[in-house]
Amino acid sequence: MPSFDIVSEVDLQEARNAVDNASREVESRFDFRGVEATFELNDANKTIKVLSESDFQVNQLLDILRAKLLKRGIEGTSLDVPEDIVHSGKTWFVEAKLKQGIESAVQKKIVKMIKDSKLKVQAQIQGEEIRVTGKSRDDLQSVMALVRGGDLGQPFQFKNFRD
């Protein structure tokens, strides 16, 4: 029986490249001359720390980072940015988290969405991913379109497509 897995992963190497590109752009921009403005990628926590001298500049840096992530093939919805910007001394910073894996609430929404579609497929939650099996390849492709079309707040990839 044909099957595939629905996962949500961020390629850390591409994220590192995007952070490096964003840092290079900030160094060359006129409005950031003489200003302490940095990006720091933490591989262990899968977070990106955006630091600057004002909250307005932190928001500008986040826009630059989102643009660079998008150019590297990482969707902006995979970056979880908290609402509040932390003020510490003379700097402002925000710690944005890269979404890895699918949370259980989102997994349940996806499975419910698939079951409500009345397609002849089965969806099983397996840890951080969802395995979808069905008799017809067309049904599986319909499920892929359904998941892509659903507004679930994070990007999904489809792996291990077996016929």
From Swiss-Prot:
InterPro entries cross-referenced by the UniProt entry: DUF520, UPF0234-like_C, UPF0234_N, YajQ-like_sf
Signal peptide coordinates: none
GO MF term list: nucleotide binding
Transmembrane segments: none
Keywords in alphabetical order: Nucleotide-binding
Family listed: Belongs to the YajQ family.
Family annotation (PANTHER family): UPF0234 PROTEIN YAJQ (PTHR30476:SF0)
Protein name stated in the entry: Nucleotide-binding protein KPN78578_03700
